[in-house]
From Swiss-Prot:
Top-level division of the source organism's lineage: Bacteria
InterPro entries reported in the protein's UniProt record: MnmA-like (IPR004506), MnmA-like_C (IPR046885), MnmA-like_central (IPR046884), MnmA-like_central_sf (IPR023382), Rossmann-like_a/b/a_fold (IPR014729)
GO cellular component, one term: cytoplasm
A GO molecular-function descriptor: tRNA binding
Annotated ATP binding sites: A11, M12, S13, G14, G15, V16, D17, S18, M37, G125
Function: Catalyzes the 2-thiolation of uridine at the wobble position (U34) of tRNA, leading to the formation of s(2)U34.
EC number: 2.8.1.13
Alphabetical list of HAMAP family matching this protein: tRNA_thiouridyl_MnmA
Broad EC category: transferase
Gene that encodes the chain: mnmA
Name of the featured protein: tRNA-specific 2-thiouridylase MnmA
CDD domains, A to Z: MnmA_TRMU-like
Example of a GO biological process term: tRNA wobble position uridine thiolation
Positions of the record's site feature: Interaction with tRNA: H126, Q335
Amino acid sequence: MKEKNKHILVAMSGGVDSTVAAALLLAQGHQVSGVTMRVWDTEPLGDGREPAHIRDARKVAFDLGIPLHVVDLREEFLQQVVTPFCEEYLSGRTPNPCVLCNRVFKFSRLLREADRLGADALATGHYARIVEHDGLKVLAKGSNRQKDQSYFLFTLTQQQLQRVVFPLGEMSKEEVRTHAERLGLHVAQKGDSQDICFIPDGDYIGFLERQSHATDTEGSIVHVSGKRLGKHRGAYRFTVGQRRGLGIAWPEPLYVVAIDAAKKQVIVGEKEHLHVDRLVTTGTNWIVAQPQQPLQARCRIRYRHQEAPCTLVVLGNDRVEVRFDEPQSGVSPGQAAVFYDEDRVLGGGWIA
């Protein structure tokens, strides 16, 4: 978006990325407002006291000279992100709440907030780009491959892409920090968030037990051959691909290859049993036109996975079969599978 004097609402987390995104838009001559979501309080707060990320966002907004709007979404976030996250884990799947938050809140709820405030567009600090291809707005990888976040954005629609801006799409993290230092912003060296925002300590098991009242439901650890090898204290304590913490002896290293929550079984096997040559996605979203014929593409099955060559076959009812040229390991039901054509995101869905 190169036109001057646009009113752009920037989603601000109090971190360096969204702060620099706002600063860049200001430098381009846009009218900029900030918005911060209050979705989950991870620290005890006294009456009237705000979480640290909101305090940081208020300070950088003040430093930049822009208004900041705070939207309290705690109840909706509990219902639409946290509860599904817990339910997915307890059903034996490995959820990706960041993708869900992007779909439900950052690029839906905040676009409605932009409408309410009379803003023309919404900007975020994601490392991704929007490019033109065959007359469409298409999501593309950020220029800095180490920080590329396009994987988390596959649910964007054409309508949303018309109104979304990614100011950091051509930048590296080092360039972002240098720009923040040049502006004298106090968040210049603020650390990156490494965990799910509502589980900052990374203790998923403890969170599930506190939040969803998961109990130590005992079940069996079973080899792919059918041999029972031991017991566990809850299938939600395991994820596909896990090797450590199984607590069983076997001549060769064993990995979790599947979880059957209904039977309370954790199925384990040797490494070769992790390999699959195909998967099916549900809830598939196409950013480009849905292909009418099998399509050669590349598929990423987790954030740090190198996309693998594959053939996409549309099955109908938002389902797509992904047929890999070479078997892939660590395919976890509940995670996102995102389809690429070189740098461009074609779409993606949830691994069934």
